[in-house]
């Protein structure tokens, strides 16, 4: 029998931590926040339902739980995503970034035994991509990337030697925008049958908001990724293309690799996309501006911010800060946490051995953080390092400097 007292303790802890989380400042680059509007479907009955009939075929209602709101997916979600990406073909069914990766790779990689090229994890590629390719029966080849530029000499060698079916550009750890057009040019010159897919999970919101270039405009055949990093959506994935045949190939792979596509989350993605159509451009521009300002302020306070020889710190949402050894890094990470500020520690960032704070400014921006909030945040980092103002209210001081959020506050 369930111990109800124990259950009460768990619920009390959950609720108290949830209240605390409402005032926290989250600086994890791979996380963001759902707006109140986008959260609505997650508390609805549709969280419990399947939905397969996206063609709205009147003779195919085998699962009727979502019938009355089907257009929220087939029109609201798909239409807004399509307009944001300027891509007529959208697959909104992946349930995560890795789910989108698996579907894209299976649909576009050709027959087992062929080669899939991805970005070397040591230079910022996703840790799972090469292994995913091998598990799906492909040979894996990797290319290095430096400051957003794929090593062209290495890529030419791979294209000529392996004639790969697919190049899967999966840059996750980067302070630079990925250069896609040069890769597309090389593919066109050396291996015309090779397809080019760009996984822009980390920069999805910056791409769809127009602050970074659209890979499809730069020559990519397809693009996709997760929808909860710089894009303020639910934990889902999405795939885009302008080519009907490639859309169908990914659709066929998805059909055999994914059953439940998490209907409520897909409705949440639709509402988030509708909001993003309104707020997205201003939000995306503010994210990059905030990241660059935060880098400058931290450097002026004596923090070791990753900086190129030309002074460049970031053109994405990511800021990298070297604190010291593992003990020193953990100490300041815990101190910031005690202030209500949550940071991400990584030990494998390109060109920065050892533990590093990998910081992202997207969520703070989404809830209304602009210049004043970024200045307040930099002061709290200095407080945490110096061990002063240890009152647990650092995040509240930052949040008090936030203005209007980049989402609707009042809705019908």
From Swiss-Prot:
The pathway is: Antibiotic biosynthesis
Which GO BP terms sit in this record? antibiotic biosynthetic process; glycine biosynthetic process from serine; tetrahydrofolate metabolic process
Task: Recall the GO molecular function terms of this protein's record.
Answer: glycine hydroxymethyltransferase activity; pyridoxal phosphate binding
Cofactor(s) needed for function? pyridoxal 5'-phosphate
Which phenotype arises from disrupting this gene?
Inactivation of the gene abolishes A-102395 production.
InterPro entries assigned to the protein according to its UniProt record, in alphabetical order: PyrdxlP-dep_Trfase, PyrdxlP-dep_Trfase_major, PyrdxlP-dep_Trfase_small, Ser_HO-MeTrfase-like, SHMT-like_dom
- Keywords, ordered alphabetically: Antibiotic biosynthesis, Pyridoxal phosphate, Transferase
| Protein name, as recorded | L-threonine:uridine-5'-aldehyde transaldolase
Species of provenance: Amycolatopsis sp
Point out the gene that encodes the protein.
cpr25
């Amino acid at each position: 029998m369930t111990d109800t007292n124990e259950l009460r303790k768990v619920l009390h802890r959950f609720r108290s931590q949830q209240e605390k989380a409402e005032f926290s400042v989250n600086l994890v680059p791979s996380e963001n926040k759902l707006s109140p509007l986008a959260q609505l479907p997650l508390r609805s009955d549709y969280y419990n339902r399947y939905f397969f009939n996206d063609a709205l075929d009147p003779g195919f209602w085998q699962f009727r739980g979502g019938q009355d709101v089907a257009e929220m997916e087939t029109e609201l979600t798909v239409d807004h995503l399509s307009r944001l990406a300027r891509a007529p073909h959208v697959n909104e069914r992946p349930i995560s970034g890795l789910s989108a990766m698996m579907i894209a790779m299976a649909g576009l990689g050709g027959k087992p035994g062929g080669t899939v090229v991805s970005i070397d994890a040591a230079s910022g590629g996703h840790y799972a991509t090469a292994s995913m390719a091998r598990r799906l029966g492909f040979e894996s080849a990797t290319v290095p990337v430096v400051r957003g530029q794929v090593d062209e000499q290495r890529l030419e060698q791979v294209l000529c030697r392996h004639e790969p079916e697919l190049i899967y550009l999966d840059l996750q750890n980067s302070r630079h925008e990925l250069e896609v057009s040069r890769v597309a040019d090389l593919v066109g010159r050396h291996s015309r049958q090779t397809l080019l897919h760009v996984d822009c999970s980390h920069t999805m919101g910056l791409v769809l908001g127009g602050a970074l270039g659209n890979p499809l405009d730069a020559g990519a055949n397809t693009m996709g990724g997760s929808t909860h990093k710089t894009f303020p959506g639910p934990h889902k994935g999405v795939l885009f293309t302008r080519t009907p045949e490639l859309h169908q190939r990914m659709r066929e792979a998805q059909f055999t690799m994914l059953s439940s596509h998490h209907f409520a989350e897909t409705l949440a993605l639709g509402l988030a996309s509708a909001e993003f159509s309104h707020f997205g451009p201003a939000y995306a521009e503010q994210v990059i501006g905030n990241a660059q300002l935060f880098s400058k302020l931290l450097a002026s306070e004596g923090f070791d911010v990753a900086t190129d020889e030309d002074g460049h710190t970031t053109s994405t949402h990511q800021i990298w800060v070297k604190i010291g050894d593992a003990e020193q890094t953990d100490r300041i990470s815990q101190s910031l946490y005690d202030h209500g500020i949550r940071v991400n520690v990584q030990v494998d960032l390109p060109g920065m051995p050892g533990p590093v704070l990998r910081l992202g400014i997207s969520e703070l921006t989404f809830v209304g953080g602009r210049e004043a909030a970024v200045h307040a945040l930099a002061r709290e980092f200095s407080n945490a390092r110096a061990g002063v103002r240890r009152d647990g209210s650092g995040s509240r001081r930052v949040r008090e400097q936030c203005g209007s959020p980049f989402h609707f506050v009042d809705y019908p």
